[in-house]
Amino acid sequence: MAKFIRNFAEKAPSMVAAAVTYSKPRLATFWHYAKVELVPPTPAEIPTAIQSVKKIIQSAKTGSFKHLTVKEAVLNGLVATEVWMWFYIGEIIGKRGIVGYDV
């Protein structure tokens, strides 16, 4: 057991250095995209989002959604699924658990 601990203690600095070297460029890429994609909407973008929602509601009322191409329908479905999943992730974080609330 002592030999294992000694070997681990000898190899740990090189393993940590390798992990840092490996993760630095990937972390920089992650932060770049996180700053771009996870930023909340600006006040100037809110009217555009409202118009988009109104357009979706209008297309549901008139039935114009039936004229979407398959590609547009798939993309709309993926966006809706992403929003739905982020809602559930927020619920899990808020509940501090996957099932049930602590009441």
UniProtKB/Swiss-Prot annotation:
It is found in: Mitochondrion; Mitochondrion inner membrane. The modification N-acetylalanine is found at residue 2. It comes from the Eukaryota. One of its GO terms (cellular component) is proton-transporting ATP synthase complex. Coiled coil: none annotated. One of its GO terms (molecular function) is P-type proton-exporting transporter activity. GO terms for biological process: proton motive force-driven ATP synthesis. InterPro entries: ATP_synth_F0_gsu_mt (IPR006808), ATP_synth_su_G_mt_met (IPR016702). The modification N6-acetyllysine is found at residues 11, 24, 35, 54. Disulfide bonds: none annotated. Pfam families: ATP-synt_G. Keywords: Acetylation, ATP synthesis, CF(0), Hydrogen ion transport, Ion transport, Membrane, Mitochondrion, Mitochondrion inner membrane, Transport. Component of the ATP synthase complex composed at least of ATP5F1A/subunit alpha, ATP5F1B/subunit beta, ATP5MC1/subunit c (homooctomer), MT-ATP6/subunit a, MT-ATP8/subunit 8, ATP5ME/subunit e, ATP5MF/subunit f, ATP5MG/subunit g, ATP5MK/subunit k, ATP5MJ/subunit j, ATP5F1C/subunit gamma, ATP5F1D/subunit delta, ATP5F1E/subunit epsilon, ATP5PF/subunit F6, ATP5PB/subunit b, ATP5PD/subunit d, ATP5PO/subunit OSCP. Subunit g, of the mitochondrial membrane ATP synthase complex (F(1)F(0) ATP synthase or Complex V) that produces ATP from ADP in the presence of a proton gradient across the membrane which is generated by electron transport complexes of the respiratory chain. ATP synthase complex consist of a soluble F(1) head domain - the catalytic core - and a membrane F(1) domain - the membrane proton channel. These two domains are linked by a central stalk rotating inside the F(1) region and a stationary peripheral stalk. PANTHER family: ATP SYNTHASE SUBUNIT (PTHR12386). Belongs to the ATPase g subunit family. This is ATP synthase F(0) complex subunit g, mitochondrial. It comes from Mus musculus (Mouse).
